[in-house]
């Protein structure tokens, strides 16, 4: 379909061009050949703009395409440009241009060779060419070009108007984007991880000593005898000072539970730096020592041996003396102040008294008296003996201390008790008064 339509269009154009050429041939000058003046020319040199006969057409072809381009009026197809050139020039104008200097008595040649020489002199050598006419023709050509430009100029401004409107619209669309972009940049960036939040301000409760104390409380393996607390971190006595519990708890929850801080490691390093030879030796000095009150009697400072007695064959030797709390077991401290604590008792109690300073000789347990008083007595719900609380005074303590010194000469391999007392693990404790009124 497309080829047919193209062919039809081409035919219509060709017909139109033939009509134009036929009109041009009807002119008086165009009825004759431009070179030999033969009648009825059917060929034309469209670049020169002249109608010629068939013989002159052959000579024009021999000149070359750069000089003359020949076409048949009826057999060839013409283009609009070629038709325009023929309309502009014609035989009359061509003679005025190419034969301006031709002599008046000049006869046109009739033979082929003479015609060829004349055609070469006329179009190739431009022997008779009017130079002034060239300027006229150039001016006419310039005028025609100007007219064509003027005809195209009103059409051209219409196109830039559309192109100018589009950039304006694009600029209007870009302006709101530019105005919105600073707003997005001005918004503060929010850290989603929350590590740099406003909660970075340190919480201070006014107690600078709580940090090392709390780090030590979190230590599972300390403080022990091999790793004692420094003097600056020693807890105060129970009866002398009272620390408010809510304040310490708040510091624990606020500071030590923070997984991203290094307070525990820093406090441990501070505590280790404070440990020195003097601070460790000061723990074993003869100064005032802390005493924990017993269950049945007041706190006392009692010396113990540095080694376990070797005469006790039924009990293993202990490397470190652990003092027993006085009064935990009824009448335990009657006269046996030098006993070793840590022996397994059937009621589950172990001693917890403070260590003393005065050493005792080995194989010495104490004067004759009950090692563990009233062990055979019926026990209470919590494993405590139902014996009455002994009443101690300073005189009895002095007597017992003197008895401890005398007992070194009477030491024996056994428990050092008469048969009446060793059999039942119960003995009379001198200087003790048992009364049931204290329990009321």
UniProtKB/Swiss-Prot annotation:
**Biased composition annotated in UniProt, kind: Low complexity:** 420-440
Q: Which domain of life is it from?
A: Eukaryota
Give the residues annotated as coiled coil: none
- According to the record, the residues making up region (Disordered) are 140-211, 410-440
Xref: PROSITE patterns = ARFGAP
Membrane topology recorded in Swiss-Prot or TrEMBL: Peripheral membrane protein
**Where does the record say this protein resides?**
Cell membrane
The alphabetical list of record keywords is:
Cell membrane, GTPase activation, Membrane, Metal-binding, Zinc, Zinc-finger
Q: Where is the composition biased (Basic and acidic residues)?
A: 140-158, 165-178
Specify the residue ranges making up the C4-type zinc fingers: 33-56
Any GO BP: positive regulation of erythrocyte differentiation
Q: Where is this motif: Interaction with clathrin heavy chains?
A: 192-196
| Stretches assigned to the Arf-GAP domain | 18-143
Q: Where expressed (tissue)?
A: Detected in adult brain, lung, heart, liver, ovary and bone marrow. Detected in stromal cells of the red pulp of adult spleen.
Q: Its Gene Ontology molecular function terms? A: clathrin binding; GTPase activator activity; zinc ion binding
Q: Name one GO cellular component term.
A: plasma membrane
The function of this protein is:
GTPase activating protein that acts on ARF6. Plays a role in clathrin-dependent endocytosis. May play a role in erythropoiesis.
User: PANTHER family, from UniProt?
Assistant: FI20236P1, STROMAL MEMBRANE-ASSOCIATED PROTEIN 1
The subunit structure is:
Interacts with ARF6. Interacts with clathrin heavy chains via the clathrin box-like motif.
What is this protein called in UniProt? Answer: Stromal membrane-associated protein 1
Source organism (scientific name): Mus musculus (Mouse)
